[in-house]
């Protein structure tokens, strides 16, 4: 059998692509080295932020607004346990923060619902938060967080119900191109398709070593909290920048545990076995202490944590482009630790590619040619 589309990597983007392409009537094969959702990539740990006024650059805003529409649609499949939780997101940092300036600019350009607060206003609304006098907060009322593993599980199930073929726990060992399409090799056999999407995350270089993607080991952890920090008490998800430039992110507490991670830093790695479990690097459990001590002093000790990986591009912007010399293969990689919120729209873009549809978005900023 020759498929219309083979998906290499069925985590965040691949799961979405499998669903949207199958729903469009294509004959699709999803593949993954493990059984998604799993602990080997960048999507585990239950939750991921979704922010609309984007500190990483205005070019992302059209993508994230479409992503939000798709997340809302997907959430209707899990109304008892919604995939998207509209908790709001407070972005905290010094008044001269470049990240916050980008958030404000995005909000202004796209007329997003963002409220600016000074330090006293932040602490009055959320007494659990402490910030210096020179801090501001930009509160995104319509943003919140996503249940990442539930989303992937839902997409995979919906794709399967729609007739998508799925080959999991089976790594792709080689990819070949010819005039007739794309061929992949796996331990289970050889498969062919007219087109392929490579969204293999951190270990994409195992297949395509020429790509400019650097794996980085990252950690996040859950700390002792109480009901004051919960969604029921209107405590928001957050990003926070310390005076030294370190960037943190976190979520409202659930079951008396608040999850937080540090966006910058981490350990550069070159193979999967270098991503050692949480607590095997001495700084893992204390990485969030500077932020907690200064901004959330009521949070208690570290309860547990997890390690994941970022697939960083050189400029930490996404790579969305066809493989050089092979217009039948789309790369979606280099998501650099801020990609999950876009998984829905990136999956839709991949499905459009498989149908020879022109994307509705300007993807020029994400081309590989920018690194030449």
UniProtKB/Swiss-Prot annotation:
Pfam family, one: DAO
Disulfide bonds, paired cysteine numbers: none
Binding, FAD: 4-34
Cofactor note: Binds 1 FAD per subunit.
Taxonomic superkingdom: Bacteria
UniProt keywords, alphabetically: FAD, Flavoprotein, Oxidoreductase
EC number: 1.5.3.-
Gene3D superfamilies: D-Amino Acid Oxidase, subunit A, domain 2, FAD/NAD(P)-binding domain
Recorded catalytic activity of this chain's protein: N(alpha)-methyl-L-tryptophan + O2 + H2O = L-tryptophan + formaldehyde + H2O2
A GO CC term assigned to this protein in UniProt: cytosol
Residues annotated with S-8alpha-FAD cysteine modification: 308
Cofactor requirement: FAD
UniProt-recorded Gene Ontology molecular function terms: flavin adenine dinucleotide binding; N-methyl-L-amino-acid oxidase activity; sarcosine oxidase activity
Family: Belongs to the MSOX/MTOX family. MTOX subfamily.
SUBUNIT field: Monomer.
Role description: Catalyzes the oxidative demethylation of N-methyl-L-tryptophan.
Protein known as: N-methyl-L-tryptophan oxidase
Organism: Escherichia coli O81 (strain ED1a)
Gene giving rise to this polypeptide: solA
């Amino acid at each position: 059998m020759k498929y219309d589309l083979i998906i290499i990597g069925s985590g965040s983007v691949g799961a979405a692509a499998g669903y949207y392409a199958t729903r469009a009537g294509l004959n699709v094969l999803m593949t993954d080295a493990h059984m998604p959702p799993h602990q080997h990539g960048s999507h585990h740990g239950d939750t991921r932020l979704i922010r609309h006024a984007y500190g990483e650059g205005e070019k992302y805003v059209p993508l994230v607004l479409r992503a939000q529409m798709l997340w809302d649609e997907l959430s209707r499949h899990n109304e008892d346990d919604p995939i998207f939780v509209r908790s709001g997101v407070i972005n905290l940092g010094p008044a001269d923060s470049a990240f916050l300036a980008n958030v404000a600019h995005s909000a202004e350009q796209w007329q997003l619902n963002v409220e600016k607060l000074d330090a006293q206003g932040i602490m009055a609304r959320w007494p659990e938060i402490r910030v210096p006098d020179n801090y501001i907060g930009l509160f995104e009322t319509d943003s919140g967080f996503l249940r990442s593993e539930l989303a992937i599980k839902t997409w995979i199930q919906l794709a399967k119900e729609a007739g998508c073929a799925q080959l999991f726990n089976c790594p792709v060992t080689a990819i070949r191109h010819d005039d007739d399409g794309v061929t992949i090799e796996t331990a289970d056999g050889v498969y062919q398709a007219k087109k392929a999407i490579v969204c293999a995350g951190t270990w994409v270089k195992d297949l395509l070593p020429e790509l400019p993607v650097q794996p980085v080991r990252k950690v996040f952890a859950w700390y002792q909290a109480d009901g004051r920090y919960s969604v029921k008490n209107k405590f928001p998800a957050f990003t926070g920048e310390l005076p030294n430039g370190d960037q943190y992110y976190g979520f409202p507490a659930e079951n008396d545990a608040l999850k937080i991670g540090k966006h910058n830093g981490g350990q550069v790695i070159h193979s999967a076995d270098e991503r050692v479990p949480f607590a095997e690097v001495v700084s893992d459990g204390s990485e969030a202490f500077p932020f907690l001590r200064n901004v959330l002093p009521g949070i208690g000790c570290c309860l547990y944590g997890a390690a994941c990986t970022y697939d960083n591009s050189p400029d930490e912007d996404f790579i969305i482009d066809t493989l050089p010399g092979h217009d039948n293969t789309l790369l979606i990689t280099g998501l650099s630790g801020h990609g999950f919120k876009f998984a829905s729209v990136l999956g839709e873009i991949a499905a459009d590619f498989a149908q020879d549809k022109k994307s509705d978005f300007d993807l020029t900023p994400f081309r590989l040619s920018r690194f030449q």
